[in-house]
Swiss-Prot record:
GO MF term (any one): tRNA binding
Subunit structure: Consists of a catalytic RNA component (M1 or rnpB) and a protein subunit.
Pfam families given in the database record: Ribonuclease_P
The name this protein goes by in its record: Ribonuclease P protein component
Keywords: Endonuclease, Hydrolase, Nuclease, RNA-binding, tRNA processing
NCBIfam families according to UniProt: rnpA (TIGR00188)
GO biological process: tRNA 5'-leader removal
Length: 116
């Protein structure tokens, strides 16, 4: 059984970690999200979430980030060994958790096929 927590070792936390996606990251666009992927060697997947002010106010942005974190916690097996940044696009604020899960599960299914 996989752990259902989200420890610091699995998070992208600092600005330089997010800036690495500007150089040579693979991109996958969905209707409401952009998934940036940087393959790495070593152990563990690290995930970060970016929601800009274009999406909504602080309450809305934090709500989206909570739902994205919960998606990661529940679906760790979908994620490949890489640094991943999930960027919410404008319009992501109207999605409920089920819609987010469906859209991102399909996206990560495509990524697993491409990089497996």
């Amino acid at each position: 059984m996989t752990s259902s927590n989200f420890p610091k070792a699995e998070r992208l936390l600092r600005r330089p970690e997010f800036l690495q996606f500007n150089e040579g990251a693979s991109k996958l666009h969905t209707q409401h999200f952009l998934v940036l992927l940087k393959l790495k060697e070593g152990t563990g997947t690290r995930v970060g979430f970016t929601v800009s002010k274009k999406v909504g106010n602080a309450v809305v942005r934090n709500s989206i980030k909570r739902r994205l974190r919960e998606f990661y916690r529940q679906n760790k097996s979908l994620f490949i060994l890489a640094d991943i940044n999930i960027v919410a696009k404008k319009g992501a604020d109207v999605l409920d958790f089920q819609q987010i899960s469906t859209e991102l599960a399909a996206a990560f299914g495509r990524l697993r096929k491409k990089y497996a």
